[in-house]
Amino acid sequence: MTTMPDMQKTSDTRKIPINKVGVKDISYPIVVMDKNKKFQQTVARINMYVDLPHHFKGTHMSRFVEILNAYREDIALDKMEPILQKMKEKLGASSAHLEIEFPYFIEKRAPVSGARSLMEYTCTFCGSLGEEFDFVLGVQIPVTSLCPCSKELSRYGAHNQRSHITVRLRYTDFIWIEDLVAMIEECGSSPVWSLLKRVDEQYVTERAYENPKFVEDIVREVTQKLLAHDAITWFSVEAENFESIHKHSAYAAIERDKKMT
């Protein structure tokens, strides 16, 4: 049998190492822990990268997918570190990175009618392994925000809009996505729901009006809650208000390493 040439293993004379190289945006089924139903199946977008020494021309792209296929029945949070270790071993790398983004669904009940519906939240698992394993959980929570300035100035109501609060965490003890969402969505003027009847719409509108928030208020309130959570060691929080009376958005961000304070 003729030996196939391995172009990736050939030498590169430019002497430039690459920090991250690999495959991006793979659509793949995964299983996520669900607080109420134990497990939830969803479909993720996955990125897999390793470093590449300066003397190699390229990495072996097919091996990333082979590793993913080897874990096809068991791609979950507790497999992040083993997958990263396998990436390092199979690709001869000193560092590996795995990014998993997926929709996660939580059943919510409307605030007055109690009507049930599913809300979608975009979540991320970001893991890396060099000498040590590092993991960051990310969740994006939609809320309603109502402008305090508009309320103060206007005789008839105030402008309001949907907002996104994005939190990323490092932690020492397991945190349920459901608990994180419930904690963070209280920092907006009002939570949002997929299904609202008329009595619910009245409640949400009036609640937001009585609870106006600037984007600055939102990130500060989230920060207070995350600082008070004993399991969280590092976090970043971003808030973006999709302004209903402007072409642009309003934005604020805070990052804290609790080990440094």
From Swiss-Prot:
A Pfam family the protein falls into: GCHY-1
Family as reported in the entry's similarity comment: Belongs to the GTP cyclohydrolase IV family.
EC number: 3.5.4.16
One GO biological process term: tetrahydrofolate biosynthetic process
NCBIfam families xref list: PRK13674.1-1
UniProt xrefs under PANTHER family: GTP CYCLOHYDROLASE MPTA
Gene3D superfamilies in UniProt: Urate Oxidase (3.10.270.10)
Catalytic activity, as annotated: GTP + H2O = 7,8-dihydroneopterin 3'-triphosphate + formate + H(+)
Purpose of the protein: Converts GTP to 7,8-dihydroneopterin triphosphate.
Top-level class of the enzyme under EC nomenclature: hydrolase
Organism (species): Geobacter metallireducens (strain ATCC 53774 / DSM 7210 / GS-15)
Protein name as it appears in the record: GTP cyclohydrolase FolE2
Keywords recorded for this protein, A-Z: Hydrolase
Positions marked as site (May be catalytically important): 147
